[in-house]
From Swiss-Prot:
SMART domains tied to this protein: S_TKc
Keyword set, alphabetical order: ATP-binding, Kinase, Nucleotide-binding, Phosphoprotein, Plant defense, Serine/threonine-protein kinase, Transferase
Motif range (PIF): 418-421
Domain notes from UniProt: The activation loop within the kinase domain is the target of phosphorylation.
Enzyme class: transferase
PROSITE patterns xrefs: AGC_KINASE_CTER, PROTEIN_KINASE_DOM, PROTEIN_KINASE_ST
Protein name in the entry: Serine/threonine-protein kinase OXI1
UniProt note on tissues of expression: Expressed in roots and root hair cells.
SUPFAM superfamilies membership: Protein kinase-like (PK-like) (SSF56112)
Organism of origin: Arabidopsis thaliana (Mouse-ear cress)
This enzyme's EC code(s): 2.7.11.1
Length: 421
């Protein structure tokens, strides 16, 4: 599936973890900031077993839910790439299951965008982040993984300023797009990181995580077809504003859905809003299926790239080779992107500090996860709305060094950021 064998994941012991704070919550899990016995900060995702078991009364069976959790852990255990997290261990108790990955101390791409005075990035900043997203998706596709949930909330910014994709519970296996090997992309050494500079940036970058829930109406069958990927999935998954037309229409989908989602992400980075959002899900899906994106402004290579990514016919949508050769990326050395030493923004150092939390035992963690799950169930029962963002604040990490031209002005109210795995 992925390069290399699946690594044997070490078992995590609550007694050897220092729980520092509650980072946030999502539809399936609660995330804690922890410090292990090597003093390394980790993001610990904890899932209530009861939440998984309740799924068998809904759209998925209990076995399917456990398979998705197992799939995500398996994928994480195989990653050896600078744009993806490493799996640092797994845990299981009578009440919860969970795993720990790299902690990104800053904001996610969505939070970083909202920190701009007009909630938009410059073309130059977009170029850097877009190049890393292209590399990340290309890596997944060459390993036979369709991501299926690309959105700014799932794009973290690491402490070194480079991106990190998270949240693979909606991903799936297909036959690899092509048999061609990926370039060597194991995590670079610190000395390599210092050497190269690709873009005309003069300062450093930041890291993060955030919200928006994902549609998980699963019909997880796989249909063999004679195209470049070898097969298609008929599952209906994704986040509604980023989901591709072929997912909505149910015609089967492959790796091209990720390039559509990249187009939505780039549009949002440029304009400050997604291109097809309606007043409700039905209207949003109608616009995705029938309306062209409104690419206002002068004709630029970025707008042309977005237009080609948001081609509704997946067979005509721009592919990875065409993306890398597009005018928007003219002059980009794809072998050196991940070696750039000074990305647009780097967060202030975070050693975990004194978070002032009373969450420090296995019982505390289990109780908090149970309480959050119970409160969520009650809200859903009262409102009937399964798509509300979680109401958990995360700490303000807006300090850091910004490249010239990347505005750090932001509204204090925008600090109500959310973390969803």
């Amino acid at each position: 599936m992925l390069e290399g064998d699946e690594k044997q994941s070490r078992a995590l012991d609550f007694n050897r973890l220092e729980v520092l704070s509650l980072l946030g919550r999502g539809a399936k899990g609660v995330v804690f900031l922890v410090r292990d016995d090597d003093a390394k900060l980790l993001a610990l995702k904890v899932i209530l077993k009861e939440a998984i078991e309740k799924k068998k009364k809904g759209r998925e069976s209990e076995d399917d839910e456990y398979k998705r959790v197992s799939f995500e852990q398996g994928v994480l255990s195989r990653f050896d790439h600078p744009l993806f997290p490493s799996l640092h261990g797994v845990l299981a108790t009578d009440k919860v299951i969970g795993y720990a990955i790299d902690y990104c101390p800053g904001q996610n791409l969505n939070s970083l965008r909202k920190m701009q005075s007009e909630s938009m990035f410059s073309d130059e900043i977009i170029r850097f982040y877009a190049a890393e997203l292209v590399l990340a998706l290309d890596y997944l596709h060459n390993q036979g993984i369709v991501y299926r949930d690309l959105k700014p909330d799932n794009v973290m910014i690491q402490e070194n300023g480079h991106l990190m994709l998270i949240d693979f519970d909606l991903s799936t296996n297909l036959a690899p797009r092509t048999p061609q090997p990926s370039p060597s992309l194991s995590k670079p050494s610190p000395t390599m990181k210092r050497k190269k500079r690709l873009f005309r940036f003069t300062s450093f970058c930041n890291s993060g995580i955030s919200p928006q829930e994902s549609i998980s109406v699963h019909s997880s069958s796989t249909l063999a077809v004679s195209d470049s990927s070898g097969e298609k999935s008929n599952s209906f998954v994704g986040t509604e504003e980023y989901v591709a037309p072929e997912v909505i229409s149910g015609d089967g989908h492959d790796f091209a859905v990720d390039w559509w989602s990249l187009g939505v992400v780039l549009y949002e980075m440029l304009y400050g809003a997604t291109p097809f959002r309606g007043s409700n899900r039905k209207e949003t899906f109608y616009r995705i299926l029938s309306k062209p994106p409104n690419l206002t402004g002068e004709t630029t290579s970025l707008r042309d790239l977005i237009r080609r990514l948001l081609e509704k016919d997946p067979s005509r949508r721009i592919n990875v080779e065409e993306i890398k050769g597009h005018d928007f990326f003219r002059g980009v050395d794809w072998e050196k992107v991940i070696l750039v030493s000074r990305p647009p923004y780097i967060p202030a150092p975070d050693d975990g500090g004194d978070k002032g939390t009373d969450v420090n035992t296995k019982m505390d963690v289990e109780n908090i996860v149970q309480e959050i799950f119970a409160a969520r169930q009650e809200r859903e029962k009262q409102s009937g709305d399964n798509n509300k963002n979680a109401n958990m604040k995360i700490k303000d990490n807006t300090s850091g060094e910004w490249v010239k031209g990347l505005n750090n002005n932001h509204d204090l109210e925008s600090d109500n950021n959310f973390l969803v795995f």
